[in-house]
């Protein structure tokens, strides 16, 4: 399912912190994060049909 992201000091400018279960990634703020089947797959930052890896938060 889709994971909501929010602004955070732990992510660089233009990225929001996305928290899903045990994973925390920074995604561009125009994207949402999804971690695949039941949330146990690899997490990506999605926008329409395009995705990219999230970056690691600094805190």
Swiss-Prot record:
Q: Locate the transmembrane regions by residue number.
A: none
Its main subcellular localisation, reduced to a broad class, is secreted
One GO MF term attached to the UniProt entry: toxin activity
A GO cellular-component term linked to this record: extracellular region
Respond yes or no to whether keyword Secreted is given for this record: yes
User: By what name is this protein known?
Assistant: U-actitoxin-Aer2b
Question: Which terms are listed as keywords in the entry?
Answer: Disulfide bond, Nematocyst, Secreted, Toxin
């Amino acid at each position: 399912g889709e994971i909501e992201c929010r602004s955070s000091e732990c992510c660089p400018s233009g990225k929001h912190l996305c928290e899903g279960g045990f994973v925390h990634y920074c995604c561009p703020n125009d994207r949402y994060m999804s971690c695949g089947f039941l949330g146990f797959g690899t997490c990506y930052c999605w926008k329409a049909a395009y995705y990219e890896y999230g970056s690691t938060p600094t805190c």
